[in-house]
Amino acid sequence: MSVYWYGKSKVASLFGTGPVFGQNANQGLAWIYYGGGLELYNELLEKLGLNIVGFFCMPMPTQPLGWFKKPIKSASDLKGLKYRTVGLAADLMQEMGTKVTQLPGGEIVPALERGVIEAFEFNNPTSDKSFGAQDVSKVYMLGSYHQAAEFFEIMFNKTKFNSLEKEHQAILRYAAEAASSDNYWRGQDQYSKDLQWLKNKAKVKVYRTPQLDAWDKILPGLEKDPFFAKVVKSLKEFSNRVAYYELMNACDYKLAYDHYFPGELGF
C-alpha cells in the first residue's frame, strides 16, 4: 500500500487512504482508472524514482477509529491520547491532539499492554480480531473519517513487467481486477461475521464515532506542496460529480434496515 511510502512522500497517501470528499472506496478506484488518478500515480512513481507498475484494487469499507479504554464522545477525549495509526491519518490525528505512534500490526497489542500506546486502529473486524485486539480492549469505535475510502494495490517490478508479452501483461491486469471483486465480496461476508463475534462472544461494545472535522485543518498546510494540491484537486473534482450521482440516486439503505431490523443499529 502506498500509505506506507508516507516517509518518502505524503502525496502517496492520497492513493488509497486520502480525505473523503463524498466518495467511497469504489469511487476512489473509479477516479484511479477513469478520472486521471492513475496518470498522477505514475507521475508520483517517476518523482520517487520507483521502478514499479501498480494495479489498484480491493476497495475497503470504512476503517474503524479503533480500540479504546472508554468511548470517544468528543474531540477533547483525544487530547494527549497515545494512539497508533499510519500515513496521512497520523497528521489528521495529531491535529486532533493525539500523540501518534506509527507501529506495524504485529507490535500493536504488546505496545498497548506495556502502555506505549493507549488506543489504536488497524483495519477491520477480521484483521483486528486475528491479532487479539478484543483481548486488550472492549471499546470499538466504528465509522471514522480518518481512512474512509481505502483501497490496495498489487505491484510488479516495472522492468520485469514490461518484458512480458502484451497478453501476459493483460492477464495480470485482469487477474488484479478479478481479485479485487472477490476480495470485496468475501470481505462483506467475513467482516460482518467477525463483528458479530466480537460483539456477542468477546463482549466488545461497538460505538459510532462522532464526526471530527480535522481534515479542513491539515489540508491547507499539505497543499503547499504543488503536487499534493494537484492530486487533491483531481480527486475532489471527480468526487464532486460521482458522489453527487451516488448520493442523489441511492435509496436510504439505513431506513430499510431499520424497518426490517428495528433497534439493531441504535442510532
Residue ranges and their predicted role:
Residues 1-27, 43-267:
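N-terminal secretory/targeting leader peptides
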